[in-house]
Amino acid sequence: YVGERIYHDSKYYILDTPQKKILVFDENGNFLYDINKHGNGPGEYTELYSFYFNPFTGDLDLLSPMGGILRYDSLGQNFKEKIPLPLTVPAVHQFIALDKDTYLLFSDSREGNKMVVYNIVQRKIISELYDLPKFLLFNTFYHHTYSPFYICEGKVHFVQSYNGDVFTFENNSLIPKYHWDFGEQNFEISDLKDEPMEYYFKYARTVGAKYANIFVSYGENSRYYITDFAYDNKYWTLIYDKQSKEPVVFNAFKEGHECIPSFVDESGVYLIGADPNYGLNILNAEDLD
């Protein structure tokens, strides 16, 4: 399936998770090349969960959950270095750079706090936070599918995928930014039990469907915040106008397509579907007015 998706330097980068490689396309959707470092040698990975263009170094960082961060040049061709992970973190599944020496790491499998702030020069965990039960991340749908981190207006943001709350990350703390009040449809995890995945397949279609949850895709620019979520066994889109401070919620465009944002910039919202008949669509910012 399609994993992480990034628009960078006039190119689309899409993680092909099963093949463990990154596909690169031009702005017209034409395939250019792939970045494939799968293997067991130096600078190679056995698993690839995420990737990131590091704004502090200009390099492409590839995240191997147990193998570390592999740093390549911006084209993904020349290997530069391997950044090992902290010994107390069994695996890292998502990441973002806070500065040239520091990363914010998210580990689904770590006991206790799932986020750690890690200084790669000192090889030291600076702080840790965000304690969630492991079963929530492995047995349920109430967790992120893509990176929970994004940058907007120079700040690192974190999306809490089970209820859509958005935070900025400042001074090693999560600062609330957006909270969506669905009233009686607000979703809480406090009553969830450690049950197998089969239990939560049924739960999501029955009890869970009564609430707004599973915020999978999201993005923000200077004018709008946009996200999609599940409710009543359908996917819905929420667009928040930061000027009017008014949200709009809808199920699909009038043409029939759902709006599941892959990423957002100042020009609009990019929608990439795994279905070959869906392809790439761009919703211009003016069309939201």
Label each region the model flagged.
Residues 1-18:
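Beta-strand-rich domains and repeat architectures in extracellular enzymes and scaffolds
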Residues 7-9, 53-57, 97-100, 151-153, ...:
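Residue-level detector of Asp-centered blade-edge/turn motifs that repeat once per structural unit
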Residues 26-28, 73-77, 119-123, 170-173, ...:
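Short loop/turn segments that connect beta-strands within beta-propeller blades
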Residues 2-4, 46-51, 89-98, 138-147, ...:
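Repeated scaffold domains used in trafficking and secretory/extracellular systems
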Residues 177-208, 243-267:
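Conserved blade-ending motifs and adjacent loop-strand segments that build the rim/top face
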